[in-house]
Regions:
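Short helix/loop capping segments that flank catalytic or ligand/cofactor-binding pockets
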Residues: 70-72, 178, 216
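Active-site environment of divalent metal-dependent phosphoester hydrolases
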Residues: 175-177, 213-215, 309-311
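Catalytic cores of soluble, metal-dependent hydrolases
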Residues: 2-66, 72-142, 149-151, 157-162, ...
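Active-site histidine-anchored catalytic micro-motif
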Residues: 125-126, 136-204, 208
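Short, structured patches in soluble enzyme cores that scaffold and shape functional sites
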Residues: 169-172, 207-212, 232-234, 306
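Short, surface-exposed alpha-helical segments at coil->helix boundaries
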Residues: 77, 188, 216-220
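Aromatic-lined glycan-binding groove of carbohydrate-active enzymes
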Residues: 204, 213-214, 219, 253-258
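Glycine-rich phosphate/diphosphate-binding loop of Rossmann-like nucleotide-binding domains
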Residues: 197-199, 211-223
């Protein structure tokens, strides 16, 4: 400890290594601002170590800076970078729930998938291959998007190991379109493609926060026909979602599930930095209730998508995204509660 403290001012010392040494922990720990200035160091998720492989990790943060699947406002390619920057405010423990993820899991930031910004099918292939290796290693991926197209190749990799998975999907939109401008892959089709390929256990899919105008009288017909549970935003207004999540936990059982959280599920008053905003959405409090309500489920992966920082000069949308990813980490199966 004396040696470490002697080198506190050295830029060569990794902040997370400092925290690990000072605490005597064998896990990676987000550094305390008592010892390391928040604006300093490499911009990684929660200032965790950056490594190129998930070998030995229990969970990892991965960025996918892709937005060529967007249909309205672009900019989600910058989501991972801004989420990481805002995550410097996050700390080691979650006092509200007692979760101690960094006393339970070995976690690191493994950088970004090298996507092809000029070819969406090629990007999907790259994502699928990258995640196949991550999932095969036994590591749970927590993904920083990127537009919602990315969930399709991620679930291809996840289902290859776990079989059809349950899904907790928070979004303003169903993302079950058949195609757009003749293209079957974009951010409005990921879950249609997942159904087509048998990647989802449709009896264990719930979509929460859906709203907005539509091109058809019943915008949710396809989802209901597949057996998805559809929870409209109007059903969530002015109420706690704790009772809903009790029902969701019963529905999901103990089989593998995936959490996909589109930031536009939240009302744009809280999260304006997104590409396809819809009014009258969920609140940050309800977002916490949804994620915390997944505690005890067999979560095999998570993503937080559609943060487009250019539309939010305050940085609050990216800050929300960073906090929600931390909350997802806190409900992973092996996380201890103090």
């Amino acid at each position: 400890a004396v040696c470490i403290l002697h080198h506190l001012k050295s830029v060569a010392l990794l902040p997370s290594a400092l925290s690990r040494c000072l605490s005597g922990s064998s896990f990676n720990i987000p550094p305390s601002a008592e010892f390391v200035a928040r604006p300093s160091g490499i911009c990684s998720m929660m200032k965790l170590p950056v490594q190129t492989s998930t070998e030995g990790l229990d969970a990892a943060f991965i960025g996918i800076p892709l937005d060529i699947g967007t249909s309205n406002r672009p900019g989600a390619r910058f989501g991972p970078r801004h989420i990481r920057a805002e995550s410097a405010m996050l700390r080691r423990y979650n006092p509200s729930t007692g979760a101690a993820p960094f006393d339970s899991l070995l976690v690191a930031d493994v950088g970004d998938v090298n996507v092809n910004l000029y070819n969406l099918p090629d990007s999907c292939q790259r994502i699928r291959g990258h995640y196949a290796e991550i999932v095969a290693s036994g590591c749970v991926p927590l993904t920083l998007g990127g537009d919602h197209t990315i969930t399709y190749p991620i679930l291809q990799a996840v289902a290859k190991k776990h079989g059809p998975v349950g899904l907790v999907h928070v979004d303003a939109h169903t993302d079950t379109s058949a195609a757009a401008l003749g293209e079957p892959i974009y951010h409005g089709t990921p879950f249609r493609r997942c159904v087509d390929e048998g990647l989802l256990d449709c009896r264990r899919v719930v979509q929460i926060g859906l709203r907005g105008s539509s091109y058809a009288p019943d915008a949710y017909q396809y989802s209901r026909e597949q057996g998805f549970r559809v929870v409209l935003a109007e059903e969530c207004w002015l109420k706690s979602l704790v009772p809903l999540m009790e029902e969701v936990r019963e529905q999901m059982g103990d089989k593998p599930i995936y959490i996909s959280f589109d930031i536009d599920g939240l009302d744009p008053a809280y999260a304006p930095g997104t590409g396809t905003p819809e009014i009258a959405g969920l609140t940050p409090t309800q977002a916490l209730e949804i994620i915390r309500g997944c505690k005890g489920l067999n979560i095999v992966g998570c993503d937080l998508v559609e943060v487009a920082p250019v539309y939010d000069v305050s940085g609050n949308t990216a800050l929300l995204g960073a906090n929600l990813l931390f909350e997802m980490l806190c409900v992973l199966p092996k996380v201890k509660t103090l």
